[in-house]
């Protein structure tokens, strides 16, 4: 061999460290892990630990912001059982049965929260408040009386209504009502009343509802049936209004679309619009402005979903005289 001589040195180092045992071993020995988290359980501000909640018999109240915070975590979900009850979790498994009371607050059976892992309880406790407004009537009916309400949450029907309208428009008129933009599915998942924790949240909710309904209307396709006059340009809502006016009175068609028009106008509500214009838009949706924001958010979603189903019924009867 020629060139510089190289050397390779190999060695090993062994080191022994003694690890003293912890006071408890929840993973290896299955010891109970004390949860150092405390919840307000009554009007006087009494606090109880997460472990003590598993004894049952109590209820907890949370700010509505809790739901959006949980849903911001990967693997989370929100399912609806009735108008004011559902299941929510920040993890793929499980789910806490919750209810919404008359003040728009979240109420939960304390025992259910007590069984959550510590990392999840750390999220929940951050939104815990003293009891106010009573237990959700529908949650109490389901968990105490075993008589679940027969009501429905509009959030659970947004995507279904859109899909059924598209199917019926294709069947009856051979047109595509909605374009089905690839982002619509994700936006629909984010549409829920808990976005409306304040006026800004209400406007943000309106913006997303407008995106999945108004902005996604396939104007070109619908105008194959509702043809605008020469040199006249119709927007999305005017096109749908004139489509409906083929089968019903034009004034009725305008009334059907009024809530969706109101939502479309509110999408710019945070852009310093005159307060009179904003209130007129809320009036079109028939939102009671004296109610909690969460309830106003519910009314907004309900009005739009209800009118989508009115449009669907008209399409289904298109060929009938």
Residue ranges: model-predicted function:
Residues 1-89, 95-97, 105-262, 298-321:
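Amphipathic alpha-helical interface elements
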Residues 102, 112, 274:
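A broadly conserved detector of short glycine/acidic/proline-rich loop/turn motifs that flank catalytic sites
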Residues 231-232, 282, 289-292:
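Short, low-complexity, polar/charged sequence segments that are solvent-exposed and flexible
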Residues 254-283:
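Histidine-centered, metal-coordinating catalytic motifs and their short helical/loop contexts
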Residues 278-286, 316-320:
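Structured alpha-helical bundle/scaffold domains in large eukaryotic membrane-trafficking regulators
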Residues 286-303:
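Short secondary-structure subsegments characteristic of cysteine-rich extracellular domains
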């Amino acid at each position: 061999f020629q060139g510089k001589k190289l050397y390779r040195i190999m060695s090993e180092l062994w080191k022994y460290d003694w690890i003293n045992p912890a006071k408890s071993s929840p993973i290896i020995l299955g010891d109970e892990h004390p949860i150092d988290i405390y919840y307000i359980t009554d009007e006087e501000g009494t606090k109880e630990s997460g472990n003590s909640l598993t004894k049952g018999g109590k209820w907890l109240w949370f700010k509505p912001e809790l739901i959006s915070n949980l849903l911001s975590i990967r693997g989370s979900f929100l399912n609806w059982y009735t108008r004011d009850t559902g299941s929510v979790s920040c993890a793929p498994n499980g789910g806490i049965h919750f209810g919404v009371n008359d003040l728009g607050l979240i109420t939960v059976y304390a025992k259910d929260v007590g069984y959550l892992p510590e990392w999840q309880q750390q999220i929940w406790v951050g939104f815990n408040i003293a009891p106010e407004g009573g237990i959700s009537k529908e949650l109490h009916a389901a968990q105490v009386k075993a008589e679940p309400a027969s009501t429905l949450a509009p959030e659970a029907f947004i995507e279904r209504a859109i899909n059924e309208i598209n199917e019926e428009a294709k069947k009856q008129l051979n047109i595509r009502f909605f374009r089905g933009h690839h982002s619509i599915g994700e936006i629909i998942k984010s549409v829920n009343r808990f976005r409306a924790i304040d006026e800004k949240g209400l406007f943000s909710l309106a913006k997303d509802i407008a995106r999945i309904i108004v902005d996604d209307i396939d104007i070109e396709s619908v105008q194959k049936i509702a043809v605008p006059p020469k040199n006249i340009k119709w927007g999305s809502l005017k096109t749908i209004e004139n489509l409906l006016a083929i089968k019903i009175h034009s004034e009725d068609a305008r009334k059907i679309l009024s809530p969706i028009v109101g939502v479309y106008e509110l999408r710019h509500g945070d852009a310093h619009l005159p307060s009179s214009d904003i209130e007129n838009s809320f009036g079109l949706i028939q939102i009671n402005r004296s109610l909690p924001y969460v309830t106003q958010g519910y009314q907004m979603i309900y009005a739009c979903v209800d009118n989508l189903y009115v449009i669907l019924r008209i399409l289904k009867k298109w060929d009938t005289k």
